Structure formats: C-alpha cells, structure tokens
C-alpha cells in the first residue's frame, strides 16, 4: 500500500516553522517512514510542475506556513488547496498573518520606497527597484507581484485545520501529524493544539 503524500510549503515567514519540522530530530524519521514527502522546498528539490501534474486531492495533507503577500504565494496556496485533502495553516503567520501582517499598517508604495530608497543603510542612487518583468542577456525573468495587503491563509483559500505558534513547538507538530495519520481528526476548522497557553505547560 502506498504511503500518504505530505507537502510542506512556506510563504511570507521567517523560516522558524520550517526549523520546527527539522527540530523533530530523530522523531522526523518516524514520520518519514509513514509518509511520502512530495514537496518541501526548504529541504528537498521539487518543482512546481511536479505538483501541477499531480491529481487533485492526491496529497493527503499540506502544512503551509507563512502569510500570503505575493502573487506567487497566492498561486501556490490555491494550487496546494486543490491538490490536498487536508490543508493546514501551520504557524501564526498562516493562521493570523503574524509578524508579516504588520505591513498592513503602511501602503505598499511607502514600504517599497523606504526599503529601496530611504532606509539609512540603503545606497541606491538610481532609485532602482525590482521590476516584475525585465530583459537581461536575452532572458525575460518574471518576479512575483507584491500584493497591497498581507493575508492569512484562510483569507485566500479554505483551510481545514490550524496549528498555531511562532513557531509551533516540535511536540505540537508531532501530535498534530500523528492525529492526521491516525485519522483522529476533530471537525474541520479546528485548532490542532491544547486549550492551554504554552507557558502553562
């Protein structure tokens, strides 16, 4: 019997959620024995076209961390929603927008102007900014568009479960993955975490 397919993906985040998965240490080996990891850009080399070629709903579960800030992130969130039976908002940024959501206090233009022109550590005499499309040596690279606002994952696609934390602890992650694999899932929309604060443990 084939193992359930699992994907990990990150959007606008710091990388701490990915680090938690790595911090499972030897416990990750037990997870890897039970699943087939089909996407994990931080650790393994997979291409978007590989995911696009998969049948819809063929990924058992995707843990997606990070807020949605760019056109590429939104596109991947929509693709992974379509390909996954269970889409899990993993970490504070995916659940609520987290620290990246603080950017919503400022217009996009103000953020770009400060970062590329006005910050005290920036030297940019020509006021050059990244362009969505440009030509260089006969190539036409495309960059993702930065959206006007930062959104949580459930503001873009339907989310099945939430795993909170900044980042979620390895213990919480392991328990949530075990619940998924064992079929011990609460109703959709539930938070896969205890009802107590982390500091109470």
Which residues does each predicted region cover?
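Iron-sulfur-associated redox domains of electron-transfer enzymes in respiratory
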Residues: 1-201
